[in-house]
Amino acid sequence: MSLLHIAVLLPLIFALIIPFLYRFVKRIHLGWFVLPVPIVLFIYFISLISMTMSGNNVMKNLNWMPHIGMNFNLYVDGLGLLFSLLITGIGSLVVLYSIGYLSKSEQLGNFYCYLLLFMGAMLGVVLSDNFIILYLFWELTSFSSFLLISFWREKKASIYGAQKSLIITVLGGLSMLGGIILLSLATDTFSIQAMISKASDIQNSPFFILVMILFMIGAFTKSAQVPFYIWLPDAMEAPTPVSAYLHSATMVKAGLYLIARITPIFAISEGWVWTITLVGLITLFWASLNATKQHDLKGILAFSTVSQLGMIMSMLGIGAVSYHYQGANSQLYVAGFVAAIFHLINHATFKGALFMITGGIDHSTGTRDVKKLGGLLTIMPISFTLTVITTLSMAGVPPFNGFLSKEKFLESMINVTHLNLMSLNTLGILLPIIAIIGSIFTFVYSIKFILHIFFGSYKPEALPKQAHESSILMLISPIILTSLVIVFGLFPSILTQSIIEPASVAVSQTSNITAEFHLFHGITPAFLSTIGIYIIGILLLISFSYWVRLLQAHPYQLTLNHWYDTSGQRIPGYSENITNSYVTGFSRNNLVIILGILIALTFVTVISVPFSIDFKNVSHLRVFEGATVLFLLIASTFIIFAKSRLFSIIMLSAVGYAISVLFIFFKAPDLALTQFVVESISTALFLLCFYHLPNLNRYNEKPTFKLTNAVISIGVGLSVIILGLIGYGNRHFDSITKFYQEHVFDLAHGKNMVNVILVDFRGMDTLFESSVLGIAGLGVYTMIKLRLKQKNQSSEVNDHE
């Protein structure tokens, strides 16, 4: 196992240890024991930067189930390293922040267990080279985020938000799994890098479009794109450290990572470029518009996050255009990838800080309602300074890092209008228009965020707590992130060669990418668009109280949340009605449906697929075998027409004994002995049970009832006979008997083949069967114990009376 594997597994190992450690260190905040884990990992991943800068990548292999292609292979390139640094870097700051945010009276053992579980899962997602392993980690992020969002499980809103996020993201994950399976069919591998090298084979596959759609659904649900964004605002019920970690820098970026990673496979499709770009832009516009009408600070940040994710998604779509060109034209559109990577980093810095500042305000005032807040400028001056810097960066105002990536975004959108590809030379004008409108509303909600909190009149009577500045532990992390906002804005070259260019190379599959960012690069269309955004944004701020009422008047019945809630209420009822229509509570009726479907499937398969039934090698029926079968049939007939339950049991036992005789004829004495013992015990148990049951008379059955039973019985019998003959006559592989004959002694050191198969070759199966019998025995013992206890209690009551 390599050091890279240990780095991925380290948070998962600590997640198992932390709950036990919590029992012994309750006097010290548990976060101090967790903090070294992400810090050590962050330092380790920083040490890999020089490797990716030089153009080298690392592949570490660990065989797990190689016979089915599931190996725990990890791959580090510029893209994976970027996300690993975000996961561990922001994770370190979040853990530090949580020490001040969460009191020692909280269930810290559970919280940090879930947080480390999520951290390890995210590292597994961004570093896995095997798609199946990636999927397992992908679902683990959904599961751990569910636990984190519902951490305050006494709140109904937390449970609702957690369930909503789990349902939507898991459905998206299942969609992605379908795409993974179809991809493996086209490439005969689960390795991501191998699939990228076989991109041409995938593009020629008949499943190409379907696979592309399935992967996009998985990515859109995870990164909260339209129409799947509705889970993210409700997930804000999580503790603020969770929101700062999951919903700014990590989980919501997993979908972006997936799109970036598989772009080399699907970018050649025009549908990929159009869909990724338009979905991203529509998400940017719709979420930024909705952010302006929110009253909850975390609600504003939630829709802000959705809009920023849409912005990055659209940039990845524009970057995919580079796959359709060569040379200088290709480099022109690679700028979309560069802008996406840079804004990915910028968003993690300013949004992570904003979530932490919001948590501090909530902690200090007891509310996040903008109607109750205001006038906190003099009371929380440090928080005010941090908020101004980070929100201006989010709004795209210089000299902060958000301005640089916003300019690159607008430049990419304007450049794409000159394309003579996919009708972009005509319809492409829509892209910068949507981008500019979305950016205008981004500017509006960003400035309004500052005004809501720190300006206006101070309303102490409306606040649950007396307002005060956040503690130093809750300020250190946002101060660090805000400092990075300034540093990356003034000195973006710190990131270009070390992080941005290697990550862009991994997405674009090209070399010699040069990332350049300038605070001012002349009077360009992008610069003029920015000036227009500021002017229109200021005008909308002045008239905010007038037009925001129109947005708030939007009826709830027309929202996606209403459709989700309505579906959640009605689908269980529909499912119950459908289930009750065929699950009637009567075993006979249930068996009729199950066996009827199996019979139908058998005969449809036999008719539609050509099979050959060969009677040449079938052995001749001997007299004593025929006599035994005849006896078996007669006994079965007696069971059907028997009037007495005792006689039915005897005939049923006769059938079992006849089968054991057949086993003897077929030279299987072990099976015959087992069948004989089972039949004897079953008969005894039947008789014992019937002795204690009331004497019920046989009732007259309807003709349709008897006819159905006869049809099902005959159909099952014919199905088994036909399948047996088909299986006997269509042997496409050598018999496995030879393998057991050759290896029973040398591998298992046994002479009885049947026993060796049961105990060694099928040992786990036999063990589980024994476990089932043990569980059944415990159930019977429990029922007997309870009955005896009830008898004793009733006798005591009678004695007392």
UniProtKB/Swiss-Prot annotation:
Topology in membrane: Multi-pass membrane protein
PANTHER family listed in its UniProt record: NA(+)/H(+) ANTIPORTER SUBUNIT (PTHR43373), NA(+)_H(+) ANTIPORTER SUBUNIT A (PTHR43373:SF1)
Organism: Staphylococcus epidermidis (strain ATCC 35984 / DSM 28319 / BCRC 17069 / CCUG 31568 / BM 3577 / RP62A)
Compartments (UniProt record): Cell membrane
Protein name: Na(+)/H(+) antiporter subunit A1
Ranges that cross the membrane: 1-21, 30-50, 79-99, 117-137, 166-186, 206-226, 228-250, 265-285, 300-320, 337-357, 373-393, 427-447, 472-492, 522-542, 591-611, 623-643, 646-666, 671-691, 707-727, 764-784
Record family assignment: Belongs to the CPA3 antiporters (TC 2.A.63) subunit A family.
NCBIfam families found in the cross-reference section: 2a6301s01 (TIGR00940), PRK12645.1 (NF009285)
Main location: membrane
Record has Signal as a keyword: no
Primary role: Mnh complex is a Na(+)/H(+) antiporter involved in Na(+) excretion.
Quaternary structure (record): May form a heterooligomeric complex that consists of seven subunits: mnhA1, mnhB1, mnhC1, mnhD1, mnhE1, mnhF1 and mnhG1.
UniProt key word Transmembrane: yes
Alphabetical keyword list: Antiport, Cell membrane, Hydrogen ion transport, Ion transport, Membrane, Sodium, Sodium transport, Transmembrane, Transmembrane helix, Transport
GO molecular function: antiporter activity
GO cellular component: plasma membrane
Entry's Gene Ontology BP terms: proton transmembrane transport; sodium ion transport
